[in-house]
Every structure is written in structure tokens, then in C-alpha cells.
Curated annotation (Swiss-Prot):
PROSITE patterns: RIBOSOMAL_L31. Part of the 50S ribosomal subunit. The keyword rRNA-binding applies. One of its GO terms (molecular function) is structural constituent of ribosome. SUPFAM superfamilies: L28p-like. This is Large ribosomal subunit protein bL31.
């Protein structure tokens, strides 16, 4: 087998650009910068907010309510 064909696998520091958190891992890259980590991601922190805009189900329910109301008046 050939020797020295694989990149060096070393200890690197991962730094979060959002909160500044850093931790150690191993990689072939010299350093890793991430946008969001588990310390500041809304899913992991429990600060997740759901943005509920009128979706297709809500639109259907509104139309269905109107049609049942108009059918009840027609009888």
C-alpha cells in the first residue's frame, strides 16, 4: 500500500459564529467555523417559536366552514 496518501487527522477547534461557543473535535481541516451550534440553536435551547401563517389547511377549513354554513341556510 502507498504511504502518506491520506490527509493528517488532527485535533481542531470548532467555533460558533453566532454565540462564540467553541469545542474540540478531530478533522482533516485546520479549523471549523459554524453558523449555529447546539448552544444557540432554537430547537435545542427550547426557545423555538412557530410561525403559523395561514397555511393550506387553514384555508381549506375556512372554505369548508363557509360551504357548510351556506348549505345549512339553504335547507
Amino acid at each position: 500500500m502507498k504511504s502518506d496518501i491520506h490527509p493528517k487527522y488532527t485535533e481542531v477547534t470548532v467555533v460558533c459564529a453566532n454565540c462564540g461557543n467553541s469545542f474540540e473535535t478531530r478533522s482533516t481541516r485546520p479549523s471549523i467555523k459554524v453558523d449555529v451550534c447546539s448552544n444557540c440553536h432554537p430547537f435545542y435551547t427550547g426557545k423555538q417559536t412557530l410561525v403559523d401563517t395561514a397555511g393550506r389547511v387553514d384555508r381549506f377549513n375556512k372554505r369548508f366552514a363557509k360551504s357548510t354554513a351556506s348549505q345549512a341556510q339553504a335547507k
